[in-house]
């Protein structure tokens, strides 16, 4: 039977989109849909065979003058009242379900969308993330799903929920890069600083502080950051948003960045030593991931509150003499295995 595979993509950062794109590419399915807010920013890289449903944001606008949080609802993370965007989203999503049946929905990520799909009789695959997700909304979303996918190895599991563990397929790690493409030997005096799109405590002040402590190192800053007009050390280059991130990273022996999933996996793919700064995220996601990979050679964590208390010169020097094993987080066939699991589920369902 013909069926549609749809991906709900959370708008925060770019990691959810990049993961969905990788899985969709591996699926090679003829009928696929991406749905989420602010997807138009990716219009130049979405394949032509994938339909895009750009949803309104679910936050109140100035015109939502009757907006209220309403009574507390334990089964959802976010369920405001009288927000037009929320009403429109629900209508657009359920209309998509109605017009594209049968459908399998891959949710990356939203408890509310997963539950809406189940209420509409649409089977789901829910992508798991690190973090303390033993709350009721997560438990209900996981129960409602036909399959849970963890884009990391089972050895990195931090949950103790037996039902969640039993339902989870562990793909191992992957990124948009390929191990086979990395042929450049790194230079010990080159360090990359990654600034993600989800918000970071790695500010210009922090970058200057680190560079001043490490005058023998040259720093490549990748990502959007507000650069003041004041002078900064000469051992810093601000590349901004660039298309040759992989090439720059591969020249660097060490990477400094936050602990978003995709950042960790990209560093792991090129197998560079990594100083991870866990940002304050819901459910302690990045801190949980840092603790999960703490045993990996070449990884060190610096808490945001300790940035200006850290001896960066010593930390960098210590890491540069270690042979990293960050690549142990990567499973070369991970994306293909996810595609196989999704297809197997769809064949059983439809």
Predicted regions and their residues:
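A nucleotide-sugar donor-handling region in carbohydrate enzymes
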Residues: 144-200, 224
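Conserved nucleotide-sugar phosphate-binding/catalytic loop shared by glycosyltransferases and other
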Residues: 10-11, 30-84
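A short, glycine/small-residue-rich beta-strand->loop->alpha-helix junction that serves as a flexible
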Residues: 9-21, 200-202
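Short amphipathic alpha-helix
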Residues: 16-27, 40-41
